[in-house]
Amino acid sequence: MQLKSTVHFLSLLAYTAAHGFVSDISVGDNWYVGSNPFQDAWKQPSPERVVWSFFDGGNGPVADLTTKNIVCNTNAQAAKLYIDSVEAGSQVTFYWTSWPSGHLGPIMTYLAKCNGDCRDNDPSSLSYFKIDEKGLENGQWATQELIANNNSWTVTLPSDISAGNYLIRHELLALQESSRRLGAQFYPMCTNLKITGGGSANPEGVTFPGAYKADDPGILVDIFNGISDYVIPGPPVYGSGSSSSQNSVESSAKKDEPAGVETPVSTTSSKKDSISTSAESVVSTFSSEPVYSSLVESSSALDAPKSTDAVKSVEAKETTKVEEVSSSALESTLNQLTQQATVTSTLYSSASPSSSPVLSSSKPASTSNPEKLSSAPVTITKTAVATEVYESRDNGEIVSVSIDSKHLPTSNAAAAAPTADNAPAHENGLYVFTVTQFATTTTYVTRAPRTTAVTVFNENVVTQVIVRTEWTQNTPVTVYARPTAAVKAATGNGASAAAEPNTGTGSGGTTPSYVKRYMEKAKDLVKRMF
């Protein structure tokens, strides 16, 4: 789990131009997929999630505190699933896709007991009691801690509450524009939860809308005017819950608490070893226009198989602790992550268009320590990676991926771009993946990138590399690589006609004809696709 946490801030860089949302939730060893406002509304059938879905054309903030949108986000719809059998006193971790470093503010989490099935309840009719909060502490905002902890936030459920169906309402509040009325930006997320065990407590709470007022001191506030004390909006934290940081005690102590409300005794931090960098600094390291490339051949053990039907697995294990990363050192850090991972690479030769896709599965004995098995980075082959977009049809579990580095030629595209007559052995556009889901390893063959362009890199001119390292159900997985000017010139991205022999134009980043041919052939050949 440490490695997953360490690199989680890279997990959905496709959305970094916008705000964040909860992409995943973990309780113990169980992982659950969040609602994706960019995709789920268009999927048929609609994906079944544990997080309430919302849609406003993206994932913008809620500013009007008088509407139902403040409860579970804009036009929220009930989640179809529950996080089942969660013991009172358990920890729940929310994983956000990304969060802009300039969006400073507090983080609050509430619970509300439903009347029967939460899916049948109007969330604005429920009573919410706060179980976690953090605002400004020692000059650092809670959202800054979220980013430093790889866009994850952990809360502890109260141990004395009664069993039943609950909504857990987790929200971030951005205050960069809160010096004006209705400038505060709320990002609430609601999740269905079945709590077991516990005691008999049924805490009284507040309702949404109603709990927040536009002129509350923690909502209408100028955070850039030398602020040292900040009053977190809403009620104090309920007594038996503990926070992921010290602030739960310190913040609630600043408020006038009603008699009988007990503050937590222990608030030990559950922060994991992390990479401290902002998502915005990462965004600046890759081109705003996606560039799609093949893997560069490396000197690693990923050698081509000897025969068409050969499948060879190579495993290498090393542990190198990654302490920090910066945008100027992403490539070297990537090599460290590669060494840290357990690498499983499966090579597949597809010289003949009639070659059958490989599909095999092996399931080792179950283990009582899924902690080790769930560390699942994307496997990288030393110097460069390709931009690929696939969808996982697995059950929301974290998976790892190995990519066949022999798929496309790695020499300069202007000098060696294949034509219809001299395409390389892998002309059918197949990729091979070894997918690891906890204790299960499966080999898949899939087609070329689902996008409209592939650019071949020369290994000498590849620059910064950014990878996404976690796959979840029905969520696109993207690996980014940024080309230099030399690469763009060599592949027809604004280059002369001579640089793009397969299209005859070479202007505006046209797609090479051999790439289009790869993709068309692959559609007919691959039986199992992400």
From Swiss-Prot:
InterPro entries: AA9 (IPR049892), AA9_LPMO (IPR005103). Lignocellulose is the most abundant polymeric composite on Earth and is a recalcitrant but promising renewable substrate for industrial biotechnology applications. Together with cellobiose dehydrogenases (CDHs) an enzymatic system capable of oxidative cellulose cleavage is formed, which increases the efficiency of cellulases and put LPMOs at focus of biofuel research. GO terms for cellular component: extracellular region. Pfam families: AA9. It catalyses: [(1->4)-beta-D-glucosyl]n+m + reduced acceptor + O2 = 4-dehydro-beta-D-glucosyl-[(1->4)-beta-D-glucosyl]n-1 + [(1->4)-beta-D-glucosyl]m + acceptor + H2O. It is found in: Secreted. Glycans are attached at residue 150. Cu(2+) binds at residues 19, 103, 187. GO terms for molecular function: metal ion binding; monooxygenase activity. It is an enzyme of class 1 (oxidoreductase). Binds 1 copper ion per subunit. Its main location: secreted. Residues 238-251, 348-368 have a biased composition (Low complexity). Its EC number is 1.14.99.56. One of its GO terms (biological process) is cellulose catabolic process. Residues 238-279, 297-329, 348-375, 492-512 are annotated as: Disordered. O2 binds at residue 185. Residues 1-18 form the signal peptide. Keywords: Carbohydrate metabolism, Cellulose degradation, Copper, Disulfide bond, Glycoprotein, Metal-binding, Monooxygenase, Oxidoreductase, Polysaccharide degradation, Secreted, Signal. Residues 312-324 have a biased composition (Basic and acidic residues). Lytic polysaccharide monooxygenase (LPMO) that depolymerizes polysaccharides via the oxidation of scissile alpha- or beta-(1-4)-glycosidic bonds, yielding C1 or C4 oxidation products. Catalysis by LPMOs requires the reduction of the active-site copper from Cu(II) to Cu(I) by a reducing agent and H(2)O(2) or O(2) as a cosubstrate. Amorphous cellulose is not a suitable substrate for LPMO9C, which may act at the surface of cellulose microfibrils without any release of soluble products. This is AA9 family lytic polysaccharide monooxygenase C. The gene is LPMO9C.
